C-alpha cells in the first residue's frame, strides 16, 4: 500500500510504477561513471532487502580469480628472477673479491674483524643512518620534519621501511597510532577524493559539452574525456613531481618516476625515499611531500572509483544485451512454434477438406449407382431379402453359384449385367 501523502500529492498518477533501479536497462541509463566516491548519504537497508539486492560472488568465480592471480604471480616471479638474479650474483661476487683484496692489502686486519665492522655498518643502515663521512654532521632521522613524514607513511599504509621504531615504547605507540590513524586517514582520503572528483567532473563536463556541439558521438566523448582526465592527472601528480624529485634528490628520471608510482600505489619499498639522502633539506620539504602524497592518493582513488563505475556500467550493459538476446531468442522460438502449429493446422484442414470432398463424391456416386440399379436392373430377378416370408422364399428356385459372384442380392445370371452397368457409370 502506498502512503496517503504519495497518493494525494499533485501530479501523481496511480498505476505508474517508479523505475526499477535493479533493472539493467534503467540502471545503465541512470548510472554514469563518476570520478570520486559517492557523495550521496548512505541508506542502510533492512536485512530482507539487503539479502535480495546483494549479489555474492560464487565460489566458482572466486576460484577462477584466485587461479588467475596465482598465475599472474608466477609470471611476475619468473620475470623478476630473470632480471634481478644475475645482478644479485654479480654483486655477491664483487663484494667477496673486494673483501679478499682489502685483507690482502691490509695485513693488520683479519677477516673476522672485517666481518664485525660490516655487520655494524649494516645495522646502522637498517636503523636509517648512512655511515659515510663525518657522522657527527649528519641530520637526524627523528627530527620534527622527519617524524611528521614517518607518521604520514604509517597512516597512509605506505611504510617505506627506511626508518622504523627501535624502542619498545616506540613500537607500542606505533601499533596504537596506526590502528587509530588509518581509519581517520581513510575518511580524509574519501573527502578529498570527492572534492577532487567534483572539480575534475566539472572540467570534463565542459569538455563534453564542447564535443557535443561538434556532433561527436557519446561513446567517443566519454573515451576522450576519460583520456584527458587521466593524462592531466598523470602530468599533475606523476610527471611534475618526478621532475622536482629528480632535481632535489639527484635521481635519474627513471628512479624519480619509479619512486612516484611506488609511493602513490602505497607499495613503498623504501629503496628510494624523498628526504632520505645525506643532504640538507628545507624544514617544510617533507611535510610538503606528505601533502603531495595525500592529494596523489586521492587522485588515484578517484581514478579507481571511475574505473569501478565503468566496469559496473559495462557489466549492466552486458547483462542488458544478454537479456535482449534471450528475449529475441525466446521470441524467435515462439514465432517458429506458432508458425509450425499454424502450418500443421492448415495441413490438417486441407487434408480434412479433401477427405470430406472424397467422401461426398463417394456418396454421390453411391446414390447414382443405386438409381441406375433401380432403372436398368428391374428385368433381372433378385433374390429375396431376409425379410421375405418363408413361403415366398421357398417358391423361388435355388441360387446357383457362378464363379462365386453374388452382387446386391442378384441371381448369378444377372451378375454380368450388373458389372456392365457399373463400368458404364464409371
From Swiss-Prot:
The record's account of how the chain is modified after translation: Phosphorylation at Ser-348 controls the reversible conversion from a leak channel to a voltage-dependent channel.
GO cellular component terms listed in the entry, alphabetical order: apical plasma membrane; astrocyte projection; calyx of Held; cell surface; dendrite; endoplasmic reticulum; endoplasmic reticulum membrane; neuronal cell body
Membrane topology of the entry: Multi-pass membrane protein
Residues with PTM Phosphoserine: 348
Protein residues bound to K(+) 1: 157-158, 266-267
Summary of activators and inhibitors of this protein: Activated by various stimuli including intracellular acidic pH, mechanical stretch and polyunsaturated fatty acids such as arachidonic acid. Activated by volatile anesthetics such as chloroform, halothane, and isoflurane.
Effect of residue 348 to D: Phosphomimetic mutant which causes switch to voltage-dependent outward rectifier channel activity
Primary site of residence: other
InterPro entries registered for this protein in UniProt: 2pore_dom_K_chnl, 2pore_dom_K_chnl_TREK, K_chnl_dom
Glycosylation sites recorded in the entry for this protein: 110, 134
Entry keyword set: Cell membrane, Cell projection, Disulfide bond, Endoplasmic reticulum, Glycoprotein, Ion channel, Ion transport, Membrane, Metal-binding, Phosphoprotein, Postsynaptic cell membrane, Potassium, Potassium channel, Potassium transport, Synapse, Transmembrane, Transmembrane helix, Transport
Superkingdom of the organism of origin: Eukaryota
Intramembrane segment boundaries: 144-170, 253-283
Region Important for GNG4 binding and L-glutamate release in astrocytes, residue ranges: 17-38, 51-61
Cellular location(s): Cell projection, Axon; Cell projection, Dendrite; Postsynaptic density membrane; Cell membrane, Sarcolemma
Site (pH sensor): 141
Region (Selectivity filter 2): 266-271
Family as reported in the entry's similarity comment: Belongs to the two pore domain potassium channel (TC 1.A.1.8) family.
Domain notes: Each subunit contributes two pore-forming domains 1 and 2 which assemble to form a single pore with M2 and M4 transmembrane helices lining the central cavity and M1 and M3 facing the lipid bilayer. The transmembrane helices are bridged by the selectivity filters 1 and 2 carrying a signature sequence TxTTxGYGD that coordinate the permeant ions. Up to four ions can simultaneously occupy the selectivity filter and at least two elementary charges must translocate across the filter to convert it into the open conformation.
Name of the protein: Potassium channel subfamily K member 2
Organism, scientific name: Homo sapiens
Amino acid at each position: 500500500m502506498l502512503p496517503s501523502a504519495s497518493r494525494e500529492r499533485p501530479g501523481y498518477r496511480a498505476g505508474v510504477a517508479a523505475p526499477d533501479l535493479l533493472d539493467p536497462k534503467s540502471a545503465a541509463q541512470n548510472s554514469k561513471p563518476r570520478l570520486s566516491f559517492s557523495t550521496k548519504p548512505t541508506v542502510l537497508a533492512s536485512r530482507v532487502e539487503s539479502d535480495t539486492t546483494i549479489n555474492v560472488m560464487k565460489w566458482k568465480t572466486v576460484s577462477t580469480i584466485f587461479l588467475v592471480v596465482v598465475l599472474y604471480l608466477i609470471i611476475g616471479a619468473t620475470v623478476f628472477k630473470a632480471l634481478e638474479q644475475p645482478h644479485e650474483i654479480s654483486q655477491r661476487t664483487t663484494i667477496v673479491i673486494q673483501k679478499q683484496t682489502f685483507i690482502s692489502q691490509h695485513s693488520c686486519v683479519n677477516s673476522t674483524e672485517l666481518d664485525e665492522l660490516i655487520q655494524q655498518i649494516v645495522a646502522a643502515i637498517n636503523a636509517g643512518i648512512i655511515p659515510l663521512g663525518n657522522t657527527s654532521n649528519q641530520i637526524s632521522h627523528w627530527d620534527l620534519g622527519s617524524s611528521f613524514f614517518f607518521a604520514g607513511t604509517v597512516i597512509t599504509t605506505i611504510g617505506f621501511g627506511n626508518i622504523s621504531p627501535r624502542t619498545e615504547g616506540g613500537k607500542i605507540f606505533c601499533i596504537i597510532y596506526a590502528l587509530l590513524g588509518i581509519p581517520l586517514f581513510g575518511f580524509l582520503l574519501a573527502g578529498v577524493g570527492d572534492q577532487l572528483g567534483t572539480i575534475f567532473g566539472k572540467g570534463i563536463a565542459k569538455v563534453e559539452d564542447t564535443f557535443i556541439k561538434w556532433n561527436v558521438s557519446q561513446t567517443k566523448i566519454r573515451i576522450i574525456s576519460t583520456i584527458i582526465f587521466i593524462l592531466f592527472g598523470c602530468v599533475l601528480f606523476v610527471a611534475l613531481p618526478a621532475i622536482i624529485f629528480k632535481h632535489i634528490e639527484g635521481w635519474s628520471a627513471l628512479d624519480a618516476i619509479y619512486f612516484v608510482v611506488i609511493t602513490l600505489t602505497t607499495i613503498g619499498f623504501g629503496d628510494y625515499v624523498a628526504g632520505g639522502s645525506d643532504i640538507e633539506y628545507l624544514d617544510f620539504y617533507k611535510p610538503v611531500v606528505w601533502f603531495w602524497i595525500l592529494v596523489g592518493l586521492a587522485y588515484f582513488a578517484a581514478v579507481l572509483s571511475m574505473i569501478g563505475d565503468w566496469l559496473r556500467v559495462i557489466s549492466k550493459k552486458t547483462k542488458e544485451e544478454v537479456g535482449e538476446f534471450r528475449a529475441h531468442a525466446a521470441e524467435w522460438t515462439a514465432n517458429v512454434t506458432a508458425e509450425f502449429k499454424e502450418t500443421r493446422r492448415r495441413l490438417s484442414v486441407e487434408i480434412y477438406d479433401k477427405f470430406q470432398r472424397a467422401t461426398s463424391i463417394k456418396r454421390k456416386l453411391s446414390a447414382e449407382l443405386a438409381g441406375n440399379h433401380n432403372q436398368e436392373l428391374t428385368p433381372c430377378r433378385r433374390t429375396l431379402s431376409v425379410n421375405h416370408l418363408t413361403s415366398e422364399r421357398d417358391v423361388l428356385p435355388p441360387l446357383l453359384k457362378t464363379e462365386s459372384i453374388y452382387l446386391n442380392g442378384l441371381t448369378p445370371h444377372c451378375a454380368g449385367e450388373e458389372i456392365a452397368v457399373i463400368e458404364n457409370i464409371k
